[in-house]
Amino acid sequence: MSRYDLVERLNGTFRQIEQHLAALTDNLQQHSLLIARVFSLPQVTKEAEHAPLDTIEVTQHLGKEAEALALRHYRHLFIQQQSENRSSKAAVRLPGVLCYQVDNAIQLDLENQIQRINQLKTTFEQMVTVESGLPSAARFEWVHRHLPGLITLNAYRTLTLINNPATIRFGWANKHIIKNLSRDEVLSQLKKSLASPRSVPPWTREQWQFKLEREYQDIAALPQQARLKIKRPVKVQPIARIWYKGQQKQVQHACPTPIIALINTDNGAGVPDIGGLENYDADNIQHRFKPQAQPLRLIIPRLHLYVAD
């Protein structure tokens, strides 16, 4: 497929996402809102977009105010829709839930509508990340050449739909991206970097090359069977834990956008019990179960690369 055809499909798919989201938000407002609870988080400024989040203060919104914030959030796709001081790199998150009373016909209609939106979002992400054939560093410029100001993460994010929950609880999740590597795999990556000299602020080209050579020597000095691990922290994420009474099971969802809960009164479902979201404090985290960690030694800080002792 030619690059021109891909751009046409990209723009066409995005227009469909916008149209279907507009139709969904209009549709939801026609139905009976049983309960709505969302939690706005502080705005991340451009100056603080790379800073670690040690505390997050939560503001609760209820009822029609919460619904209005949620419906606007679903359609928040461009930086032009937010403050000029707000970071365009930090994710815009609004955890919470909207609960609507539905019958069988309305439930099926909304399920189909949301499924279609999620299919379009997945297709759009596939075009950008796979079909474009571009490395991650080049995708930003390519997407914004055709859709200026797009917040790509908001365009990718699918909507979460649940049916007849008994309870909904919110919380925070701290995660790490973990990848196991061999010594030779790391040496191969460093060798590629050494073969393409460049400057990386605040280092000059020569200083960066020297830094890479030192890293290469440190890894080469390890035994060939050394166990290496990238353990990169991910910014804390809001989550929702859903309990289904009939199935006697709990399901956990990431909750960057308000969940849509359909309460089917044809099937005798009742209004769920919805909890709040506490402020986040990194110094006050309680782990239900924390397994004994493997002893690790940091060897290349910029890569979050550790070696198992």
Swiss-Prot record:
Pfam families assigned to the protein according to its UniProt record, in alphabetical order: Ter
Query: What keyword terms does UniProt attach to this protein?
Result: Cytoplasm, DNA replication, DNA-binding
Please state where this protein is localized: Cytoplasm
The question of whether Cytoplasm is a record keyword is answered with yes
Q: Which GO terms describe its cellular component?
A: cytoplasm
Would the keyword ATP-binding turn up in this protein's UniProt record? no
Molecular function (Gene Ontology), one example: DNA binding
Coiled-coil residues are none
Q: Which GO terms describe its biological process?
A: DNA replication termination
Biological role: Trans-acting protein required for termination of DNA replication. Binds to DNA replication terminator sequences (terA to terF) to prevent the passage of replication forks. The termination efficiency will be affected by the affinity of this protein for the terminator sequence.
Under HAMAP family, the record lists: Rep_term_Tus
**Similarity remark:** Belongs to the Tus family.
What's the protein called, per UniProt?
DNA replication terminus site-binding protein
- Report which gene this protein is encoded by: tus
